[in-house]
Design a protein with these regions (language model features):
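Sequence/structural signature of beta-propeller domains
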Residues: 2-9, 18-337
Length: 337
């Protein structure tokens, strides 16, 4: 992913902060490597989806720099068993995938690091089979009501396509009725809720709950009001970019960019595991709320930290310091102009 310097530095610090979770997030639960994307063609897996109609297949796309290709992955071996080319499509910045109605697949060209794309696109195709083929997708043009946004997450809720923007402040869920019977090809998105900061992917569980992720955690959200009802820690990854729900059950697969990247399988805590306090994403929990973070999922090789309170807080203090430096630098630059 191509990031501006300041954002890249900030995300690096936030990732370090996430490596030592604050008190209240306790590591437990089984996590396993489901498969590895070892094919040399997959270098920047930025989207992941699990097939609903073809058992044992997953799909991924590369970040910007590759062509308009969808790779079918055998989940038993991690091998690429099919490549689907999207005919007539220019891949600007593929950043997300999702599953749609009637065994369709969403390929979201919604990345916009510089926030200068007036229109972004989501391409809809039938879930590919094994083998190589070229298909002509249904391409949907999307416009934000409040100007361009960077985004790396797409999902469907009922007949609505939902995009989750990737921002440090003011991130949101934006929706459009893309899958109604009289659907067109161009839509103005509507903001329907607030999202956590720096979301890199999202998915929908079979019970209807939405799971979004950042570089270190997953957040459980109810789409009837877009309220955050839980969170859990994700396995440590070089650059965690993907999350996809299994075809059945409360299981998700989480992956990273990079060559030979591992895809982890983990279970999402069930409804009520944290009291379902109804907090909206970004709201702080308090003792009065009764909120308790859901049990975290961590790899067996990386047990949760048992260090002192000072050690637990150190990464967060470092993150705050770097953010302050970035803000100061920006202020100096404005004065020069």
């Amino acid at each position: 992913m191509r990031l501006v310097r300041a954002a890249g530095l900030t995300m690096t610090v936030l990732a370090l902060a996430g490596a030592a979770a604050p008190p209240g997030i306790v590591g437990s639960g089984a996590v396993a490597v489901a498969f590895r994307m070892s094919d040399p063609r997959i270098t920047e897996s930025s989207g992941l989806a699990i097939s609903r109609s073809r058992p044992g297949l997953a799909y991924t796309v590369n970040d910007s720099g590759d062509g308009p290709y969808v790779y079918a992955i055998d989940m038993g071996t991690g091998a690429v068993v099919g490549v689907t080319a999207l005919a007539g499509v220019e891949a600007v910045d593929f950043e997300a995938m999702g599953t749609g109605p009637d065994a369709t697949l969403l390929v979201a060209d919604i990345g916009d690091n510089d926030a200068d794309r007036d229109v972004v696109r989501v391409h809809v195709i039938d879930e590919p089979r094994r083998g190589s083929v070229a298909v002509e997708p249904r391409s949907v043009e999307l416009t934000y009501p409040d100007g361009p946004h960077d985004a790396e997450a797409v999902l469907t809720v009922g007949d609505r396509l939902v995009v989750v923007t990737k921002e440090f402040v003011g991130a949101g869920f934006y929706a459009a009725p893309v899958f109604t019977e009289d659907s067109g090809t161009a839509f103005v998105l509507r903001r329907v809720g607030d999202a956590p900061a720096v979301v890199t992917d999202a998915t929908v569980l079979d019970d209807g709950r939405v799971v979004v992720r950042d570089y270190g955690r997953g957040y459980v959200v109810r789409p009837d009001g877009w309220r955050q009802v839980g969170r859990f820690r994700l396995p440590r990854m070089p650059q965690g970019e993907t999350i996809a729900a299994a075809d059945i059950g409360q299981v998700v697969y989480a992956g990273s960019e990079g060559t030979d990247s591992a895809v982890y399988r983990l279970r999402v805590p069930g409804p009520g595991a944290d009291g379902e306090t109804g907090r909206r994403p970004g709201e702080r929990s308090t003792a009065a709320s009764g909120h308790t973070d859901v049990p975290a999922a961590t790899p067996p090789s990386t047990p949760p930290s048992t260090g002192s309170g000072t050690a637990q807080l150190a990464p967060w203090l470092m993150a705050g310091g770097v953010l302050a430096l970035i803000a100061a630098a920006a202020a100096v630059r404005r004065r020069r102009w």
